């Protein structure tokens, strides 16, 4: 399955998704979206069609388009359960979730 991540290098939300993709060893292509160039490439019609909120990240998984970093990470965890991003212990899972929100 082709995975494309539309990302900006300084976006903490996109960074979360890059971390998840790499921890899961998923082959993916990073498509840079410059949020500053010419008023922001995220406002171009071609990008707005992927995410009407004009935000990064966006993940294309085959023909499906996903947005919002935590929703993307949950999708990756459910679609590719191994290696797991979340521990089995409830307290440890809470710690990982809190840490992900700090990024």
Predicted feature residues:
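GST-like domain detector, emphasizing the conserved glutathione-binding G-site
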Residues: 1-103
